[in-house]
Amino acid sequence: AVMSLLYIAQRQNNNWIPLAAMKYIAKFLDMPYIKVYEVATFYTMYNLSPVGKFFVQVCTTTPCMIRGANKLVEACKEKISENESELLSDKDCSWMEVECLGACVNAPMMQINDDYYEDLDKEKTLKILDKILKGENPKPGSYRGRVNNEPENSRKTLMDLKNA
């Protein structure tokens, strides 16, 4: 119940969990506040400080790093802030590196609020960030034209080397 209530509290507080919300959850569940705090600080999906209207999470786990996640991080540093978790002056956007978001097959990728942006490179990432900073909603999904997680280059099997 703690994780679900933390998730709800985060949704109700502009994507972060204030201390008052954690204390309320502890009281509601009749458990020590420190236990709620332990859960909130253990999982990276909970934000304990304001993150902005647009919260960009760049996966930097091994599959994404091998495929160029460092270029996505460079784009975030150029467009949003040199430092992770630092809000833009208008408080509209922040970014951070995160552990696996579960879209390894379409690496490298990032999540902005609830949407996944996959098969990215630096140029595509910069364009997406430009759009969100203008208040626009870029199209989520693959930026190589793949549908879901279909193979690239029309490969049908692992042995299909001619299309590799």
Predicted segments — roles?
Residues 1-164:
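Signature of N-terminal electron-transfer/Fe-S-associated modules in redox systems
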